[in-house]
Amino acid sequence: IVRYIYKGVKAMKPWVKVSTCPVGKYRDTSRYPSRGWNAFFTVYQDPQGWMGEGIMDQIYPMMYFQGNNFYPFALDWQEQSNGRQVVPGLGIYFLHPDEGKWTRDEIDRQMNFIRSQKMAGEGHYRVKYLMENTQGIYDELAENFYAYPALQPPMPWLDNVPPTAPSELKVTDINNGYTELKWQAATDHDSRNNPLYVIYASNEFPVDTNRPENIVAQGVRETSYIYAPILPWNAKKHFAVTAIDRCGNESAAVQK
């Protein structure tokens, strides 16, 4: 069934991510046992097999555990991912006293571990507890972990060719401290995978497009953009524009 669905989706829209939310432990690992409840033997899921065969793009394992029930199994997912994207789901609902006795430090440790292993991200279950800022988790994420924008991780197993770069960037100061950017479009002609644009701004030239704090907009469809800084006295002086396709491949930048 999984193979049939994957091939059907890719035949119609190759850039669409096929993903699944498996049980948090695949099976026993050499580091720690799953203690009888796992994806492979208990509920008959084989997400590591699907990733190995190349018929799954992302997995979101439900890893609502602590300590040895979390770290060995998170590492196992990443090691057996075949380069696909692993996004562990974290049990932030345990921060609420009616659900458990976790502290925010537990979530911090898990997120730092995920980043140290270069996984594709993390999910938070349930969003109710995130939006209610349980134990300050929303503020913590906004101030520290998610302080800057992020681009989608690329999917090189589907397409690893970046779009051509936009060109002829023009920067014009207009009224009220706003700045207008205009550029020539990337010259790719795949109507099913037209690139979008990412705008970067900095006081340093050239603008470093590897620094997420320099991203001011993404998903821009047009070949123009009005830069309107929240604090006019903190407006940036230099700009860069890149093209990005549906598979997350980013072009070189045109700078001004």
Task: Mark where each language-model region is.
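Pro/Thr/Ser/Gly-rich low-complexity, intrinsically disordered linker/stalk tracts
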Residues: 136-192, 233, 247-256
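Solvent-exposed loop/turn segments flanking beta-strands in beta-repeat/beta-sandwich domains
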Residues: 186-212, 236
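Beta-strand-rich modules
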Residues: 227-250
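Short S/T/G- and acidic-enriched coil/turn segments that sit immediately N-terminal to beta-strands
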Residues: 221-227
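Glycoside hydrolase catalytic-domain groove-lining segments
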Residues: 1-31, 37-98
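Short beta-strand segments within Ig-like beta-sandwich modules, predominantly Fibronectin type-III
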Residues: 215-221
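Substrate-binding cleft of secreted/luminal carbohydrate-active enzymes
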Residues: 47-70, 84-158
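An aromatic-rich alpha-helical recognition segment common to small helix-rich domains
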Residues: 166, 181-185, 199-200, 227, ...
